[in-house]
Amino acid sequence: MADVAKVAVESPLPHLDRLFDFSIPEALDADALPGCRVRVRFHGRLVNGWIIERGPTEFDGALQPLQRVSGPPVLTDEVLGLCRRVADRYAGTFTDVLRFAVPSRVAAVEGRPPQPPASTPAATDMGVWAPYGLPDQGVSTWICHPHDDPFDMLARAAVDTVARGGGAVLVVPDARDVRRLHAAVSALCDPELVAVVSAEASNRVRYRTHLQILDGSRRIVIGTRSAVFAPVTDLALIAVWDDGDDVLVEPQTPGWHAREVAALRAWQVRARLIVGGYTRTAATAQWLVDGTAADVRLSREAARERRYRVDALVEPDADRRRIPARAFAVVRSGLEQGPVLVQVPRAGAATGLICAQCSHPIRCSRCGGGVRPDRAGRPRCRLCHELAHACASCGAHDFVGVGAGSRRSAEELQKAFPAVAIIRSDADSGVLDTIDARPAIVVATPGSEPRVPGGYAALLVLDTDVLLARSALRAREEAARRWMAAVAVTSDEATTMLVAPQDLPVVQALVRNDLASLAEMDRQERAQAHMPPAFRCVRLRGTSSAVSEWLAAYSGEVLGPLETTDGSEALLLSPRDRASGMLHDVQRIQADRSKAGRPPVEVRVDPVDLGEG
């Protein structure tokens, strides 16, 4: 019996997430290979699909023939298997994931002869990793010292991997990071070995780059989140930098996180995985508890020798002001040496609540989630929707909103330092990549800090309560990540001043240079609340009737449903060791509802914005 093509049809409908058999016309037989795009007639319409395999069919009727084969194979078996695992991990469909793994076809760039292979680099000096004790294999969760260069370190790991005969994929959050990492790698090896995968590139460039990676001429891939799917030959190293940045989460269905995809892929091909940042996430702290990752950070001796100075202060209640006198002193002293960085949160309405008595962020007494005013102005948890009645720290009942912006900060600082240049770097005024080393005050929002040769002479972090009072499960983790990113652009001798209560765990972690303990504290608190990463969580969103109908078909642990401004929301929870059953049930219910034509319910697994509203 002649082979048939088993095709995954591109469709958003969950009940069509399976393979369909199509006959192969003789004229297409030589071209109809696994990994090829095809056009097929499906339910009376011409649609796109992918040949996943060829083989015999169990169907005894007449099959629809393939209509067209669109180009050469561009989907490898390894990436195909990865897409299936990611779909199952995020309760999505195979083709929903596949669209991120392979760029759209541009026929004009096909058929070009492969480039001659670039010269294999010599083994590079890995001495920068020596104080960290990086293992030669397995999974590593890495806390980088803020005054080390993580891009040089990752570049060296990648080039060393290629020198040993392997390939490498390096994933970073944004285009600025891509440029820095590309420069670091290109300084160590032939740039022709390197491919850049970025959403900023045109589709023509992205498709040409994909073909170059496929033919093996590009051994190191650098890019933003979708680069994690790049079909690198002999993949031996995957690295994800700054995994706490939520831009590593794909906003479209099914909402995968590049860190989790990297972990699935590293397990699948037995590649080494390095996940790092200036801080550690609760997710990778969970890997340490599970025994699946190595703890990579400076040795105790090296950390003692290279302490970075972080201080915290809060003015006495009677003299409380937004920029305390001691903070002005830090700025004044820093200006004698060079530019000073002032980090402020983005402007806007109140993003959370703090205690009017002691300034501690208000958090839910039931689940630990952030609290913010609801539509009626009542202090309500955005995670479990309980009302908050008292500050957990001092018992006071009066709460105040928090919120501030870079423009107001710049105006205050200009009044205090009229002879000093004030530079803003933010989304409103424009983000600067670099400035020179002349004395100036740079007011920047998180992620917009320009770099300066030699680093800033001082750092002042204002309005810390805004980040800490965010109504998100990850508020403390995110605050530490943003503040440490600012510390990383200071000089070795700089002082960092946080205007924040000194007894807050996140502040103490920075003061003590101990980000590992903070990550473990976050992990433990979330485990007690049955929240990720110790538990898998699925968030359902839809109309009230659709969510209620969906839940009627489900028998596991549920929080909710609760009414929201847009309809209804519920959370499904499961211990991780039983999560595969929950996710399978979610896929089954979604498929059943799709087949029956029921109203859609949005599904998100382990959403990073849990608790926000």
What do these predicted ranges mean?
Residues 189-201, 365-366, 374, 418-428, ...:
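Conserved RecA-like helicase motor-core motifs
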Residues 1-309, 333-336, 358, 450, ...:
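Accessory, non-ATPase domains that flank or precede helicase/AAA+ motor cores in DNA-metabolism machines
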Residues 307-331:
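C-terminal boundary of histidine-terminating zinc-finger modules
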Residues 62-72, 313, 392-399, 463-470, ...:
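Short hinge/gating elements
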Residues 322, 327, 332-416:
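Cys/His-rich short segments
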Residues 72-76, 147-151, 171-175, 252-255, ...:
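Conserved phosphate/pyrophosphate-binding and hydrolysis machinery centered on Walker-type P-loop NTPases
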Residues 34-37, 280, 325, 329-333, ...:
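C-terminal helicase module of SF1/SF2 nucleic-acid helicases/translocases
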